[in-house]
Amino acid sequence: MLKFTVIAGLNDKDTKQQEITTEKAIEKIVDVLYLAKVEGATLTEVKGLYIHEDGTAVFENSIKIELLFITEETAKNICKDLKIELNQEAVVLEVTELNSDLI
């Protein structure tokens, strides 16, 4: 089984500042997950460092999203949608193989 961990920063890629509240960003993330027909996810507020393509470094609020029981294609589509919804240069997608089940 694969576990997908997505990390999305909350600073706008153009202004390099957080333009929407963390709560509003979480609402947008939940909407993306709902439209992707994800049946469950764990969201955690974290802090992250990101170096933009122009070399600017930012320390930003981020959301870590842990997903099970979906396909890699679905995970990649979620990342693409989050890049648009949150106006990001990039979104992290980590894929881990593990043994997990709902009990």
Identify the role of each PLM range.
Residues 1-103:
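Positively charged, small/polar-rich N-terminal and surface patches that mediate targeting and assembly
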